[in-house]
A protein has these predicted regions:
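Short, conserved catalytic or adaptor-binding loops enriched in Gly and charged residues
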Residues: 63-68, 157-161
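Short beta-strand segments
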Residues: 33-34, 55, 96-98, 117, ...
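Short active-site oxyanion
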Residues: 27-30, 48-52, 70-72, 139-140, ...
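Boundary-proximal intrinsically disordered activation/regulatory segments immediately upstream
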Residues: 1-61, 146-147
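Glycine/small-residue-rich loop that forms an oxyanion/phosphate-binding "nest" at active or ligand-binding sites
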Residues: 66-98
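Short acidic-hydrophobic, aromatic-tinged amphipathic segments that line or gate anion-handling sites
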Residues: 3-6, 72-77, 165-175
Length: 193
């Protein structure tokens, strides 16, 4: 495990950028996750962990499992650790992993599918993904204007569903056509103020 001693550390800066910048997440294909529960969910799902940062003095068998999987391990004192977090009171572990890659083929035979268009609030999106998994939906389609499904707030709100529930991004017309071809009826609701 490498001890981070400077705010200029490349791994620390990488994690902080993953939390702040959608373009950076997209270019690296990684997402930022926080907490021991999420680390366990990532490991159980087979997600490819890249960088794991723990607070000085904190340990868990999950950290050893991440190391065995090939993740780079770092520790940092509280003041530096907080720089990588997106929350005011960070948990004991922050990590990056590869974003799950789902293609439109995940919709074939998926059964019930939830299609979302223009859902911009990250917390709401994460909660909906978590609920969709709880109701055993086969997939979720995100259309234009939806929040980034790999932003830290969405990932945190999913409580691990982001690793298990196929989440496909498609234009609305293409998604509707594909679902129709699969024999799925489309029902719509819209908020009018």
């Amino acid at each position: 495990m490498i001890e981070i001693q400077s705010r200029q550390n490349a791994a620390l800066k990488h994690l902080a950028r993953l939390g702040r910048e959608r373009k950076y997440r997209r270019s690296t294909g990684e997402m930022l996750c926080e907490g021991e529960k999420m680390l366990g969910e990532a490991l159980r799902s087979g997600a490819k962990l890249k960088t794991v940062l723990v607070k000085d003095g904190w340990d868990s068998p999950l950290v050893k499992a991440a190391e065995e999987q090939g993740a780079s391990l770092y520790s940092a004192p509280d003041a530096l650790f907080k720089l990588a977090s997106e929350v005011e009171t960070p948990q004991n572990v922050i990590f990056s992993c590869e974003q799950p890659q789902w293609t439109a083929d995940a919709l074939d035979g998926a059964g019930q599918v939830l299609l979302l268009d223009g859902l911009q609030d990250p917390g709401n999106l994460g909660t909906i993904l978590r609920t969709a998994e709880a109701f055993a939906l086969g997939a979720v389609v995100l259309c234009e204007g939806c929040a980034d499904p790999f932003s830290p707030k969405v990932v945190r709100s999913t409580m691990g569903a982001v690793f298990r529930l196929p989440c496909v991004t498609l234009p609305l017309a293409e998604a509707a056509e594909r679902l129709h071809r699969n024999g799925l009826p489309l029902y719509a609701t819209a908020l009018h103020e």
